[in-house]
Amino acid sequence: MASKVNSDRCWRGVLRGVDMVSRNRVVRTEDYSNYCGMHDSYLAFLPDDLRPDPGLRPESTWWRWRGGRIHIERVPRSDAAVRMLLVHGGGGHAAMMWPFAALAARQGFEVLVPDLPGYGRSEVESAGAVRYSDWVDCVADLVRAEKAADPRPLVVFGASMGGMLAYEAAARTGMVEAIAVTCLLDPRSPLARRRIGRFRWLGRFGAPLLVPVVDGVRVPMRLVANMTAMSNLPGLTATVIADPRGGGVGFLRTYLCSVPLVEPENFTACPVWLLHPGADRWTPLAVSRMFFDRIAAPKHLLVLDRASHYPVEDPGIRQLTTALADIHHWVAGG
């Protein structure tokens, strides 16, 4: 009970601040200590020499979208030639992406990481009413807004379910220079559904058993997704499972029924880098390759050795870091 009270106090503290509106962004003045240590909890699993300088902290900003406010963490760099938008997956949030955002900043990117609707600190009228299509629209709209505000080249990095969101954003906007993803899960595939879900029946029968009448029920992701396979590091898996984020059943149902706007055979929006963990027990490489191998655009595959679904293990995390540097160099025209 005490931890619940402390958590509530922490979030109330986070939501205090002064709004400063610039274009369609609302910037809040907040102290990093209000983040309740979530960022550092995830950073702790990076190899020591890859952890950022303690002085590197994200800035909290807010973007008005569909009557709500999307929380976006940023590492501004006015001298950066390339910007990177990082997109989390189901059950994730910006703080969970901080280790990868910090590595991207270290490779020269200006970085932004949104909390997608219903997760993290973003504010929506009803989290239980959020559908997968809202996430697709949100990421695409954010790409458009960011490109309108800043013409620098933009790369979208998608982790887990965020991989398909990055793909959709590039296909829908035509404004992305490249996408980098850790996996590409097409939920139309029974094999993909079996790997996504905690229960085998999800792969066999899929969305029809998740009837709309229960769409508004909110459940922790750990109860429906195979989150015990998040990492091969027990401590990291425990951290993720304990993270109190939950999504509506309607979100899962609409995700399982989703169809990409552009089939991979017709996707030519930008090059695609698949940076796939080599020891991913949740979504093995074969699942992603069913979609990736069909993509018409120039594409690159890198298997991250000994890395799990949340890829922080050596040597995979170093390979990912090098790949980010290579992508930056390529997009910047070096």
Language-model regions, residue ranges each:
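An N-terminal hydrophobic leader/cap segment in hydrolases
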Residues: 8-64, 68-75
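Active-site glycine-rich loops that stabilize anionic/oxyanionic intermediates
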Residues: 89-92, 278
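Catalytic nucleophile-loop/oxyanion-hole region of alpha/beta-hydrolase
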Residues: 91-96, 120-151
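Conserved alpha/beta-hydrolase
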Residues: 94, 101-125
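Alpha/beta-hydrolase-fold enzymes
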Residues: 159-245
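Short beta-strand/loop motif that positions the catalytic acidic residue
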Residues: 268, 274-276, 280
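Short alpha-helix in the alpha/beta-hydrolase fold that links the catalytic acid
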Residues: 270, 284-293
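Catalytic active-site module of serine/aspartate enzymes centered on a nucleophile-bearing elbow/loop
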Residues: 298-334
